[in-house]
From Swiss-Prot:
Protein name per UniProt: 4-hydroxy-3-methylbut-2-enyl diphosphate reductase
Listed HAMAP family: IspH
Primary enzyme class: oxidoreductase
Organism: Buchnera aphidicola subsp. Acyrthosiphon pisum (strain APS)
Cofactor note: Binds 1 [4Fe-4S] cluster per subunit.
Alphabetized UniProt keyword annotations: 4Fe-4S, Iron, Iron-sulfur, Isoprene biosynthesis, Metal-binding, Oxidoreductase
Domain of life the protein comes from: Bacteria
Catalysed reaction equations from the record: isopentenyl diphosphate + 2 oxidized [2Fe-2S]-[ferredoxin] + H2O = (2E)-4-hydroxy-3-methylbut-2-enyl diphosphate + 2 reduced [2Fe-2S]-[ferredoxin] + 2 H(+); dimethylallyl diphosphate + 2 oxidized [2Fe-2S]-[ferredoxin] + H2O = (2E)-4-hydroxy-3-methylbut-2-enyl diphosphate + 2 reduced [2Fe-2S]-[ferredoxin] + 2 H(+)
EC code: 1.17.7.4
UniProt-listed GO biological process terms: dimethylallyl diphosphate biosynthetic process; isopentenyl diphosphate biosynthetic process, methylerythritol 4-phosphate pathway; terpenoid biosynthetic process
Entry binding sites for isopentenyl diphosphate: 41, 74, 124, 225-227, 269
Catalytic-site annotation from UniProt: 126
Pfam families listed in its UniProt record: LYTB
Quaternary structure annotation from Swiss-Prot or TrEMBL: Homodimer.
Gene name for this UniProt entry: ispH
């Protein structure tokens, strides 16, 4: 059996930044660090942070006054921020800058009372945070998940309408939904390029290339990871047998019967150690040394926000 690794795979710049913020906060603050929701959707990462003393909560009311709170990489609504301020919490925002970019645009639409359509998955924390940027009672924000939703959608003023997207969607499906929106609402405005992030795009392109070679594809990521699920869906759409696994423990040997090429990728919130463990397991049962595919080299780095520079400065001074 041959192992083929996609490039790029695993952590994106937004996830790396979020984890760095938490690790820095743990070194600087001599009190419990609370994180609202899972920092990123990967159980290995969450368990690792828990072992370091981090406490995860779903509601701000669960956090004692004057504590340190970190908002997850998915972002939060304006209401959540207000709740944190009311409790006089020390706020560290780990929202991905690409998600924050969408927040800013939705806020602008809200300020102008321009009706707004968000393409995304209902219940996902990023979607809830983005919808929560729109608070103008004279306007409205709508969520669509499919072309059918577009067909059933009614707005108050189709001549003054904006759309935005969740950052971790399927490229192909999103383009179809946008086309349906533009067909139904010819005067709708949106970003020149959909808001799907570079990392999501790069990983989906890599999986499509991988599917031309692999007999089976393992997507390493947690079940609640949107971008990991999209990678698994894409693999299946190409006709390649594809499985979303959280670790090597999920692999069943029967899947590998008569398999020559095993493809491996990892969602943007999955650490490389999980990839390494999968490779080690496959090597033990007879697979050859992995081959790396040539792919896009991601150079993007998201800096820590100015309000957190004091953390970095303290760390630098302490060596």
């Amino acid at each position: 059996m041959n192992i083929i690794l996609t490039n790029p795979r695993g952590f994106c710049a937004g996830v790396k930044r979020a984890i760095l913020i938490v690790e820095n906060a743990l070194k600087v603050y001599k009190k419990t660090i609370y994180i609202r929701h899972e920092l990123v959707h990967n159980q290995y990462v969450i368990n690792t942070l828990r072992q370091k003393g981090v406490v995860f909560v779903e509601k701000i009311e669960q956090i004692p006054d004057y504590s340190v709170v970190i908002f997850s990489a998915h972002g939060v609504s304006k209401k959540v921020v207000q709740e944190a301020v009311k409790k006089k919490l020390i706020i560290l925002d780990a929202t991905c800058p690409l998600v924050e970019k969408v927040h800013i645009e939705v806020s602008k639409s809200s300020e102008k009372a321009i009706e707004t359509i968000l393409i995304g998955h209902r219940g996902h924390p990023e979607v809830e945070g983005t919808i929560g940027q729109y608070n103008n009672k004279n306007g409205k924000i709508y969520l669509v998940e499919s072309i059918e939703d577009v067909h059933n959608l009614s707005v108050q003023n189709s001549k003054k309408l904006n759309f935005f997207t969740q950052t971790t969607l399927s490229i192909t499906n999103t383009k179809k939904i946008i086309a349906a929106l533009k067909n139904k609402f010819p005067e709708i405005s949106g970003p020149n390029k959909e808001d799907i992030c570079y990392a999501t795009t790069n990983r989906q392109i890599a999986v499509r290339q991988l599917s031309k070679i692999a007999d089976i594809i393992f997507v390493i990521g947690s079940n609640n990871s949107s971008n990991s699920n999209r990678l698994a869906e894409l693999g299946k759409e190409t006709g390649t047998f594809t499985k979303l696994i959280s670790s090597f423990l999920d692999i069943k040997k029967k899947w590998l019967k008569n398999v020559n090429y095993i493809g491996i990728t990892a969602g943007a919130s999955a650490p490389e150690i999980l990839v390494t463990e999968v490779i080690q397991y496959l090597r033990k049962i007879g697979a050859h040394k992995p081959i790396e595919m040539i792919g896009v080299r991601e150079k993007k780095i998201f800096k820590i926000p100015k309000k957190l520079l004091n953390i970095k400065t303290i760390l630098d001074e302490n060596g």
